[in-house]
Amino acid sequence: MPPRPFTALIVVLIALTTGGCASAVSAPLSAPGPSTSTSRSTSRSRTVSHNVITRVVTFVDSSRSVKYPHHHAIPRPLVTVIRYPAAVTRPLPLIVFGHGFAVTPADYHRLLTAWAQAGYVVAAPVFPLENAHAPGGPDEADLVNQPADMSFVITGMLALAAQRRSFLAGRISPGRIGISGQSDGGETALAMAYDRYYRDPRVRAAAILSGAELPNSQAVYFPRPSPPLLATQGTADKTNRPHFTYDFFRAARRPKYLLRLIGAGHLPPYTTQQPQLSIIERVTIAFFDRYLKGEPAGQAAMAKSGNVRGLAALTAAP
């Protein structure tokens, strides 16, 4: 039996994700993990909205632990919100998304839904100690553990897709995996794609939304080869200062793209602020279309959507 803080977190997340509706709860699903650990996954809910199915699944990494305040350490739970197109059964690219500090994937529901509507399976884990509902309050010291969380979710998602009776059976293309993240989730995704210590070679493209290099990182970023990069940044961001994004963008290898959101701040462009959110949706989809789906038109679509007078400017180094 998981400790009460973890159980409460699942209940809160389901309510935020499904609007309080937890229909069609399925039986537990098993998902084999990497050789150094075991994984368990449990489907918590299923809803359908805007032709996108949303499920909440819990992956458990028994090779690592987490300790909530006033509780003993337990295997690391990764409650994960999964979205995928309702009408598509062929293998699709996978995008794993990392949320920022003191929020949850629910805050980014419009962006993540747009990706799923565009033909992607989208998985967004809730980081155990950085999320808004973490017992005792969010703890940013856990940031260094999050790249491994996202890698573990990739492993769990591929395992589910390989199971004949899974709701994801045959829906994920293992060779077309992208990652993204915003704020601390952007730092997590950046490390997972480009930091030699955390790098996951399964990643084929990365969209870093107002992110930065991990604090006090001594690792070498952008070894050869490096996956294509899209970096986005609000020019008026006072939380993740623009130079953090500009610094890693300059160091990155081609192909790389920088989308500057003129006058935009830190979180709202990715959650509620318009028309910036719509610009983010179009540019990120075009980027993933180009580098995960192999669509040449994606590059022109990025330029068209990413250059909006007074709102956005795209720098491209293909």
What does each of the following model-derived ranges do?
Residues 225, 231-233, 237:
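Short beta-strand/loop motif that positions the catalytic acidic residue
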Residues 100, 181-185, 189:
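Gly/Ala-rich beta-loop-alpha elbow adjacent to hydrolase catalytic centers
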Residues 27-33, 40-90, 96, 121:
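Short conserved active-site loop signatures built around small residues
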Residues 88-92, 97-135, 238-241:
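Short substrate-entry loop that stabilizes the transition state in hydrolases
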Residues 236-240, 266-267:
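Acidic catalytic loop of the alpha/beta-hydrolase fold
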Residues 107, 139-174, 191:
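Alpha/beta-hydrolase active-site loop
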Residues 263, 273-318:
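Alpha/beta-hydrolase-fold serine-hydrolase catalytic core, especially in secreted/extracellular enzymes
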Residues 240-250, 273:
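Short alpha-helix in the alpha/beta-hydrolase fold that links the catalytic acid
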